[in-house]
Amino acid sequence: MKFCPSCASPLVGREMGDRTRLTCSSESCGYVFYDNPAPVVAALLEHGDTVILVRNKGWPEKWYGLVSGFLEKGESPEEGVLREVKEEVGLKGEIVSFIGAYPFSEMNQVILAYHVRGHGEIEIGDEIAGVKAVPPDKLRPWPLGTGQAVRDWLAARGGLGPTVA
């Protein structure tokens, strides 16, 4: 972002408290760009005796992660995670528990992760390039993003394996 969305003046960095924030260069405007993280929901999705991992279109061939997506306006995190499960893999979801909230600074997101049980037959959605069904004892957390939720879910089950680098 280079220009103020209110008056089109250039944005400049200014010290505000303990942070540098982009602010409007026009003294009469006062616009401040806070760059708040976007809320993302993620489902550690159990289907039968497996955990479902998905590969989004545009991801490298070997990358798989949890079903996840951005919240829609007016949607609760619980509604959002169930919608994402339906959109991405066609399953009716049932929330088992909240796993946790995780900062994902690299993408300027905060991830709200849920343990969800899926019912029905998997139907791959438009955004998904592939699906893997992984037995929980073979599931390994990855270091970024939703991998932290996998780590905590496995630890709560007493089955934490080594993190995949």
Where do the protein language model's features map onto the residues?
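NUDIX/MutT-family hydrolases
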Residues: 124-155
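Conserved Nudix-box catalytic region and its N-terminal flanking loop in Nudix hydrolases
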Residues: 46-87
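A short coil-to-beta-strand element that immediately follows conserved catalytic motifs
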Residues: 14-15, 92-100
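Active-site-adjacent beta-strand/loop module that shapes the phosphate/pyrophosphate-binding cleft
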Residues: 100-123, 136, 153-154
